[in-house]
């Protein structure tokens, strides 16, 4: 895909990916370099690895208990089931059913495609978000109650991203789903996470505008949830 002339930094691949791809284990991003120097890939595998090695308030982000672990895995799997619909199963070649590609190419959100699928009690996407809502522990604030897990981190990232790169706002996903909102707001208040996004805010401002899409806006919900002004 060629970049629109005169845009810096280039919003699409500038050739870097062609050089990097052969060095990745699965031909995809993200990747993570382990202390041994080995490179691993696949998003959820990376999340589980990090979750087994990172603690929050004395608890690992990937649970030790098998029953809790399967709840975390199934929740993350459900989030991944939503991705193909929002990206577009046929990619940019079928742009009218590719919500993410539509905004990336500066064509705006595909409301006519998304709104029926998010209709309460009827839409297939709405049902999937309802499943996520119902899976979260009632006592909260997180999926497993008081214990933060990597599933909550993935939910925070997904809702923030989808609420700017696919939907005009997060509202369509959060309306009548208070537990999802409670979880992502709680994640955003974690100091290390808010500092991470705060440190990157200025660099996001340098991102280009393509058509009606200001690429910096892709990060607006991360800043909102982290209460970064």
Sequence positions of predicted segments:
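Generic, ordered loop/turn and secondary-structure boundary motif
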Residues: 41, 61-63, 143-145, 174-175, ...
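Residue-level recognition of oxygen-bearing side chains
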Residues: 45, 179, 192
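GST-like domain detector, emphasizing the conserved glutathione-binding G-site
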Residues: 1-119, 138, 219-229
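A short hydrophobic/aromatic micro-motif that marks alpha-helical segments and, especially, helix-coil
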Residues: 57-58, 83, 166-167, 205-206
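Active-site-flanking alpha-helical
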Residues: 51, 55, 158-159, 197
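C-terminal helix/juxtamembrane-tail motif
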Residues: 194, 201-229
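Charged/polar, low-hydrophobicity segments characteristic of intrinsically disordered regions
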Residues: 86-88, 186-205
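GST-like fold's C-terminal all-alpha helical module
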Residues: 71-189
